[in-house]
């Protein structure tokens, strides 16, 4: 489901999908399942800026003995799961279901990127995540 992909992370067709939640990322790392390989931020920022959206690179063991590398996953750090769930759902329902919605969060200009999953019951969240605009 979209919720699992975004907030828990999944393995699909031999690659890591989702895992866009900083709390789950932290929990997986403390269990030894995630190996953090670095992060990137906007190049126009100074090191002392308060960055809330980060793009991380990591490997994830999960149940597979072979570690897979996810080259990029963006996360909104420091937020609650409830806030992220509400913002991502609202962007999907009120915005473009296969595109992005702009969001101002404090001084940050963000984009919420949504990807729809279609079934005979209609469109559902396939994936959604935050990016710096």
What label would you give each PLM region?
Residues 1-104:
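N-terminal "domain-start" segment
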Residues 82-133:
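Compact beta-sheet-dominated globular domain cores
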């Amino acid at each position: 489901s979209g919720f699992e992909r975004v907030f828990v992370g999944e393995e699909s067709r031999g690659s890591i999908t989702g895992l866009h939640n900083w709390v789950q990322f932290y929990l997986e790392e403390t269990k030894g399942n995630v190996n953090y390989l670095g992060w990137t931020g906007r190049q126009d920022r100074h090191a002392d800026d308060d960055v809330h959206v980060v793009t991380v690179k990591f490997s994830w063991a999960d149940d597979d003995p072979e570690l897979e590398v996810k080259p990029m996953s963006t996360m909104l750090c420091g937020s609650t799961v409830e806030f992220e769930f509400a913002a991502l759902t609202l962007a999907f329902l009120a915005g473009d279901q296969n595109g992005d919605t702009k969001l101002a969060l404090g001084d940050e200009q963000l984009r919420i990127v949504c990807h729809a999953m279609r079934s005979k019951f209609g469109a559902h969240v396939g994936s959604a995540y935050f990016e710096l605009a």
